[in-house]
């Protein structure tokens, strides 16, 4: 969230798109800035201006909104979002609504707790926002404003021909069993034990207090941000990155998916194995932008410890053995019910 604007993979992807389709560069940058640089984008939207990222845009240190845009997805962005269009198609793809008519200093920040007059005055004085209790901050539809994303696609003539569902995490959750028991916030903002003071001044302990960890599965990107913190203008400390990585690895290993060999049979010289993969998340696995993937890696050894079958191995660059897509970007590896050859690999 905090590094949404600094994500080098995202920046490189957007840049590649603008170089490939220069006539649509402004449209692409404005669209992508909506959710990755929402503070700067919202500020420009108030003046009906287009948000640019490269050149003289937000990435330029000389831009008036450079620092604001680099803050990525901040507290005051999400907590200003109104619920007027929640769950409706117009709320998706960065369609969040923020009150731009009320002057700064009088705008509302929504939260889950009731706020007394004195604490409200203190917060308004310190932050410029008036705290207001509203249960909509606990709804998954809040997250859906950016995590249900449809992006335009181009036809052979270079014209926008429609939209493609780039990610539909909210809709996946909405159609899952989790929709009746858990919200996005239940997993991404785990509740702290006990009650917690919500202010350094006149703050009485309250609960449940949701810890804003937003733990995902992208350990690779967190490692890259940590290693290149200076070049990427990262403000988090080394210890904070280590803590985040620890949470990611814990989630991936214990609360993401389980792999179980249900049955293994040897008939003559033939070994057959039934494998069950169970998702433990409230949406597709893997979820999010399409570059993410998960795959089955099955290795069979003989009595001497030598490998006699290996499906799903990978090299130092992350290329999966047998994956047609790694060999040719225009191809896709087929899905399999049965794998009989090491060059076949089940990829999700």
Predicted regions and their residues:
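Long, well-ordered hydrophobic secondary-structure segments characteristic of membrane-embedded
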Residues: 2-57
């Amino acid at each position: 969230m905090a590094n949404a604007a600094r994500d080098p993979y995202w920046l490189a992807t957007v840049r590649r798109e603008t170089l490939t389709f220069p006539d649509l560069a402004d449209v692409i940058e404005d669209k992508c800035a909506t959710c990755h640089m929402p503070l700067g984008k919202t500020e420009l939207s108030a003046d009906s201006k287009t948000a640019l990222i490269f050149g003289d845009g937000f990435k330029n240190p000389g831009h008036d909104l450079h620092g604001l845009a680099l803050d990525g997805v901040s507290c005051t962005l999400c907590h200003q979002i109104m619920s007027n269009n929640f769950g409706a198609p117009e709320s998706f793809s960065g369609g969040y609504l923020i009150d731009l008519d009320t002057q700064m200093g009088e705008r509302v920040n929504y939260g889950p707790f009731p706020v007394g007059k004195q604490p409200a005055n203190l917060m308004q004085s310190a932050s410029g926002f008036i705290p207001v209790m509203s249960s909509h901050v606990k709804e998954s539809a809040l997250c859906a404003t950016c995590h249900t994303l449809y992006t335009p696609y181009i036809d052979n003539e270079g014209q926008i021909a429609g939209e493609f569902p780039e990610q539909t995490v909210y809709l996946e959750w909405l159609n899952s069993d989790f929709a009746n028991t858990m919200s996005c916030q239940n997993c991404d903002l785990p509740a702290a034990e006990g009650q917690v003071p919500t202010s350094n001044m006149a703050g009485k302990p309250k609960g449940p207090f949701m810890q804003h960890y937003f733990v995902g599965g992208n350990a690779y990107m967190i490692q890259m941000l940590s290693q290149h913190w200076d070049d990427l203008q990262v403000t988090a400390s080394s210890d904070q990155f280590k803590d985040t990585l620890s949470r990611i690895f814990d989630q991936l290993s214990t609360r993401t998916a389980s792999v179980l060999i249900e049955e293994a049979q040897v008939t003559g010289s033939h070994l057959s194995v039934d494998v069950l993969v169970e998702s433990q998340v409230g949406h597709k696995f893997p979820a999010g932008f399409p570059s993410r993937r998960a795959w089955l890696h099955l290795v069979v050894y003989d009595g001497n410890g030598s490998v006699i079958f290996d499906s799903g191995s990978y090299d130092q660059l992350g290329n999966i053995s047998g994956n047609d897509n790694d060999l040719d970007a225009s191809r896709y590896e087929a899905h399999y019910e049965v794998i009989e050859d090491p060059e076949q690999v089940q990829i999700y």
